[in-house]
């Protein structure tokens, strides 16, 4: 039995969505829904599932029919996370470029801390046989891993979702317990930082990166024929920072000014005055 109001816990967890990419087995979808319902999560997004709908989904989602009715189906991962501010991509393997990597427990704490600040969060799970592609993982701010037995580190997707959902719930309960204790202290601890601008969404960042790469190409810093790992490293950099709206528009304004200067479409005011005096 929970010591806290389940309605309040579920309200915070409602800002966290579970995303399953190209899931093959309908049973995994049904089991994932039941795992989510047990821990108080409610939003599941399926990216191009191989088989949907299917009787096995209903059978395995026993008791979670309300969640099943709310499942969202989309064609791409970009669409699934477009309004999210913070994205975690699950990964069991090291990649070409090291990415900010968190075990499930600290990752859950970060997710719940962000949710408490009004952010939308996505936890993305890949295919049963090969997980997420490098391109899909590059859309995440952080990679998330579950520290399993190195001799037999095998979890199916539904089991992994159960572990993650449990850790998310425990993070909410722990946060509420800390807040309750802090209220009795002279100086409350663990308070969230109040920011003056909202963070940008993943959809906005997907407009940001092409602009950045176009500007870098125009100043001949990026070779589009041989970009090497530069675009990926830039994604890692800005994904780690999490831009707010003001920073986003500031940087895009700088990119546009650099492009204008490079193309000769913009001149400094002093140059304009000098031209006028010589006329």
Predicted regions and their residues:
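Post-transcriptional modification and biogenesis factors for structured RNAs
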Residues: 1-279
